[in-house]
Amino acid sequence: AGVSKADLLIAATSTQQVNILTCVIGKKLGVKKCIARISNSELLHRRDSFDYRSIGIDEVIYPETLGASEIKTLLKESAVSDSYAFDKGKLRLIGIKIDERSELKDKTLAETTYLNPDTSFTPVAIVRDIEDKIENETIIPRSHNILKQGDIAYFIAQSDNGVDTVLSLSGRENLQIKNIMIYGGSDLAYTSAKHLSKKYNVKLICEDLPKCEKFADELPNVMVLNGLGTDVDFLREEDLDSMDAFLALSNETEKNILASLAAKESGVKKTISQVENIEFVPLAHNMGLNTTINIKYLTANFIVNYIREGELLNFTSIEGLDADVIEVEVKEGSNVLDNKLKEIGFPKDGIIGGVLR
């Protein structure tokens, strides 16, 4: 397989022991860098006390921690469907669905400039549902493009005032979240419940009785219940309609979508659904479930950022958006210095969302 000539080995099977052993063997055969996926969060926390490089592992990934961190951000910024920070949060990429409340609806980007007098935000992408097509269309917007009802619009916004301006124009505000219901017996559900219970009141619904007993023992601050996440009557008996957020985090995409729809019908204002099958993302969005999470995407972003460290400051690929977001540093000697974009051959299907100076 030529492993001795490889610059990078990524061991990301579902079996932790196989991944660790693969990296150990790979390093001995001459691989320059090795990344191992782990399934035990305790190993992640030991990075400060144990030198993984001594056994041939340069970096460890625990995807569920990446997912739990993403969920924490999405709950904090509950008015948006996506949120990513750049340069320690000075700029943010946010996604918002355009509905009847939005002042941006039915306006071209040129017509919205008066709503953005201090240029605190820039529209950078539009995801639109196209009738009779399974996949949504991604548009890199220009001044003539119109924002339509049902679009998911992505903005690069200044954190200090741009984000609030976009939320205000969209008729949205962040919710004060206190009570959360989580459905699922997955590692992501467990990890999320563990982290979120430090700040919120958390109920965890799990269909597997042995897992329920295990979770109840290990998560003292979480109310663990045995039941079906798609049983609406059961969920309502457990006060679904009084929840501020519902997280469908089982390993079954279809059940997550159904459970989130039930939560939405019951009046829960914020839902987050784990969607393992990428082809289901447009379907979920078209059904009104705008906030989805896919830990494969998060893991891929982590790996790309690791590989490109030094070349890119940040790389982000967003599920459902047929475009990538990159953050780069303009270095001395670069061809773009002191030149206009039209003079440097900047891609027509690209856009600069912001400049940090």
Language model regions located:
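Cytosolic regulatory regions of ion transport systems
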Residues: 1-357
